[in-house]
């Protein structure tokens, strides 16, 4: 159903490079406007309908709600994340221009690639491959996560969404030794089946894993994340994606490993199949 090859890796790299060139951080409103416009169009190209919620004081970074509803689908997978990135403070300490994607030593370097431009780009590429799968998809994105999500905290409780059967975090995590850190909570039979499948995949690939019943770390704390506060509730939650110990999110020489993209693709396929049956 899902495929990931070198062509997909290059497309992901190109998309991420383009977004990075916009410099989409709060002090550059034009960059946030450019990236939000491009993301909206890419969702539309994948067959999603779009709703935006605009802050009158910051119209350049709307909340984006992308929906794809399929006749006959019984389940809905929800995703959440953000399209803004952290500004660069210690630019002189970077080994390359943080606003240009640099491919070096099997990693892509650039501000925001791990948090979370590349994970978002990969998902859009995979969504484009899903044409007839009986599964509803929802993606909620904000453009102010790096400044504490003030408008999202106000608006997310008011968003009218259908019942979501599984919420997937903006990304996941792998350790330096290659082990995957699988983060989840609100466990039920469905997520146990998914977990068993991910564990089996890791065993086949001789990859270790650690299970943590908690959400992904948040810069402002989980108690201040609008997604965890107002979207997830008691719905099963899972964090998977290509970030790792070398990503140095918010730090100097932020990077991501493209070699983890095929691994994540297989796990997304497992999830989509489980919820479309």
Question: What is each of the regions a protein language model found here?
Answer:
Residues 53, 81-83, 143-144, 170-172, ...:
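Fold-independent oxyanion-binding glycine-rich loops
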Residues 72, 176-177, 194-277:
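An extended, acidic, His-containing surface patch that forms the Zn2+-binding/catalytic region
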Residues 51, 77-79, 140, 166-168, ...:
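Hydrophobic/aromatic beta-strand patches that form the interior of the parallel beta-sheet core
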Residues 45-54, 103, 203-216:
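Short secondary-structure junctions
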Residues 75-138:
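Active-site metal-coordination/substrate-binding segment of hydrolases
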Residues 112-186:
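Acidic/histidine-rich catalytic neighborhood of metal-dependent amide-processing enzymes
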Residues 1-91, 256-263, 269, 274:
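N-terminal helical capping/dimerization or prosegment-like subdomains
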Residues 115-122, 190, 224-228, 264:
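Catalytic-loop motifs flanking and including active-site residues across diverse enzymes
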């Amino acid at each position: 159903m899902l495929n990931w090859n070198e062509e997909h890796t290059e497309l992901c790299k190109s998309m991420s490079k383009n977004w990075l060139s916009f410099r989409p951080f709060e002090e550059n409103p034009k960059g946030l406007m450019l990236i939000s416009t491009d993301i909206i169009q890419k969702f539309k190209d994948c067959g999603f309908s779009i709703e935006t919620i605009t802050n009158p004081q910051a119209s350049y970074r709307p909340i984006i709600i992308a929906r794809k509803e399929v006749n006959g689908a019984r389940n809905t997978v929800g995703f959440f994340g953000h399209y803004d990135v952290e500004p660069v403070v210690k630019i002189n300490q970077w080994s390359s221009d943080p606003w240009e994607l640099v491919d070096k030593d099997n990693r892509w370097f650039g501000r925001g690639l791990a948090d979370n431009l590349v994970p978002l780009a990969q998902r859009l590429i995979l969504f484009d491959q899903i044409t007839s799968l009986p599964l509803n998809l929802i993606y909620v994105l904000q453009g102010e996560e790096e400044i504490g999500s003030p408008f999202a905290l106000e608006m997310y409780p008011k968003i009218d969404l259908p019942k979501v059967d599984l919420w997937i975090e903006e990304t996941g995590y792998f350790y330096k030794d290659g082990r995957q850190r699988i983060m989840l909570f609100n466990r039920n039979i469905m997520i146990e089946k998914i977990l068993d499948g991910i564990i089996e995949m890791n065993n086949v690939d001789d990859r270790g894993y650690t299970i943590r019943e908690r959400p992904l770390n948040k810069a402002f704390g989980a108690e201040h994340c609008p997604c965890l506060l107002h979207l997830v509730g008691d719905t099963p939650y899972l964090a998977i994606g290509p970030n790792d110990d070398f990503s140095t999110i918010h730090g100097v020489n932020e990077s991501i490993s493209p070699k983890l993209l095929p691994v994540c693709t297989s796990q997304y396929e497992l999830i989509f199949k489980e919820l479309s049956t």
